[in-house]
Curated annotation (Swiss-Prot):
InterPro entries attached to this UniProt entry: LipidA_acyl_PagP, OMP/PagP_b-brl
Residues with a covalently attached lipid (N-palmitoyl cysteine): C22
Name the record gives this protein: Lipid A acyltransferase PagP
Job of this protein: Transfers a fatty acid residue from the sn-1 position of a phospholipid to the N-linked hydroxyfatty acid chain on the proximal unit of lipid A or its precursors.
Lineage summary: Bacteria, Pseudomonadati, Pseudomonadota, Betaproteobacteria, Burkholderiales
E.C. code: 2.3.1.251
GO cellular component, one term: cell outer membrane
Topology of the protein relative to the lipid bilayer: Lipid-anchor
Protein location: Cell outer membrane
Organism expressing this protein natively: Bordetella parapertussis (strain 12822 / ATCC BAA-587 / NCTC 13253)
Subunit comment: Homodimer.
One family name in Pfam for this protein: PagP
Keywords: Acyltransferase, Cell outer membrane, Lipoprotein, Membrane, Palmitate, Signal, Transferase
Signal peptide interval: 1-21
Lipid-carrying residues in chain (S-diacylglycerol cysteine): C22
């Protein structure tokens, strides 16, 4: 449990770091720093709720599937904007129950190209870059990742899905979560 609190403290330290001035950053990183600063200072507030993960039945034995937790309950907070092109960009921090019912913290950045179907309905496709920590991977040492991200939204609510790739007996998980803009 101590390792969990260390990982959570690490993620919480990332949040205030986004508000720092970008002038001292190298020129190649300044644009990213300015965008993160914009999201943090101008973005709306988001509530994230997690709830479901599906393990690809073709990649695991029946016994292993039965041992997994597929109700990935959890939640978190974030900030996001729709940029000058109408694309969504956000920062988030969440914690949820992983496949082994252990708490998995995650914090990151998401980007999606948004297609509007109507005034209130939208579809998105993009990616998320994140840091996470798992008990079964590197003994809770935080590690980075990047995953695809698709969404369908209506007004202030958005449903997201990502697929965690893997090989036979690991990964291959569809993870779904929601976001409420408030």
């Amino acid at each position: 449990m101590t390792q969990y609190f260390r990982a959570l403290a690490f993620f919480l330290l990332l949040v205030p770091a986004t508000a720092m001035a970008c002038d001292d950053w190298p020129s190649w990183a300044r644009g990213a720093c300015q965008r993160v600063d914009q999201i943090w200072n101008e973005g709306g507030n988001d509530l994230y709720l997690t709830g479901y993960s599906w393990h690809n039945r073709a990649m695991y034995s029946s016994d292993k599937i039965r041992s997994f937790n597929e109700l990935a309950w959890g939640g978190g907070l974030g900030k996001s904007i729709y940029d000058e092109d109408g694309d969504w960009q956000g920062l988030y921090a969440m914690a949820f129950l992983d496949s082994h019912s252990d708490i998995e913290p995650i914090a990151g950045y998401g980007f999606q190209k948004i297609g509007r179907i109507g005034a209130d309905t939208r579809l998105g496709i993009g990616y998320t870059v994140f840091l996470t920590s798992r008990s079964d991977i590197m003994s809770r040492v935080p590690f980075p990742g990047i995953l695809p991200l698709v969404s369908a939204g209506y007004r202030d609510a958005t449903l997201y899905a990502t697929y965690i790739p893997g090989g036979k007996g690991n990964g291959n998980v569809l993870f779904m979560f929601g976001r409420w803009e408030f």
